[in-house]
Design a protein with these regions (language model features):
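Duplex nucleic acid-engaging cores and interfaces of nucleic-acid transaction enzymes
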Residues: 1-179, 183-185, 191
Length: 191
């Protein structure tokens, strides 16, 4: 089979394809694109993110003094599903100010193993090429895409929670008696 692969690859060497390695790289890129566009693959990775994603933040080198108000997040790591909304919003604020570097990531090895179980069959040169393509699909295409998706979703949930808390606090302020514990018989609106 491996000789067969080499012969098959040589048939694609023409035009912009210089050698066998170029042809194999092109084939791996095509496979990686197909894996990343497959809804089943995307759902597998989404499930991994929702179950075990970790949000991590680190201070940007050289900005330690400027980022002092974010010192709690200089070397921070926590499961995303347990990260409170105010903490997530603070981390994102530090990131948008260019003071923190933030990532959301599941266990990369477990994700690639799941994808490989879906796509890699056998143990030969062909399967090794497919395995390499699957790992590339995860690292270069799937992970960044799903990470962006989860960053947006988690920010949206945190924003909704912050609005809910703010609305509750505002309601309590508006419903509070205007003069505290003092009794009021009436208020003259013309005064």
């Amino acid at each position: 089979r491996e000789n067969n692969l080499s012969a098959r690859v040589r048939s694609f060497i023409r035009g912009g394809v210089k050698d066998e390695e170029d042809a194999l790289k092109g084939a791996r890129d095509i496979i990686a694109e197909q894996v990343s566009e497959d809804e089943r693959s995307r759902n597998q990775i989404r499930n991994q993110f929702s179950r075990q994603a970790i949000i991590s933040s680190k201070v940007v080198k050289g900005k330690e003094e400027e980022a002092a108000k974010y010192k709690d997040y200089f070397d921070f790591s926590e499961p995303l599903k347990r990260c409170t909304s105010h903490r997530l919003l603070a981390i994102r604020r530090g990131e948008s100010e260019g003071l923190l570097k933030v990532s959301i990531s599941p266990n990369d090895e477990e994700c690639t193993e799941r994808l490989e179980r879906s796509y890699v069959r056998g143990n030969n040169e062909c399967s090794r090429q497919v395995q390499e393509a699957v790992r590339d699909a995860y690292k270069r295409l799937l992970k960044p895409s799903i990470e962006t998706e989860f960053a947006a979703l988690s920010k949206e949930k945190a924003d909704e929670e912050a609005i809910r808390v703010f609305a509750g606090n505002l309601r309590q302020l508006l419903l509070a008696p205007p003069l505290g514990q003092k009794r009021v018989m009436g208020i003259d609106p013309g005064y």
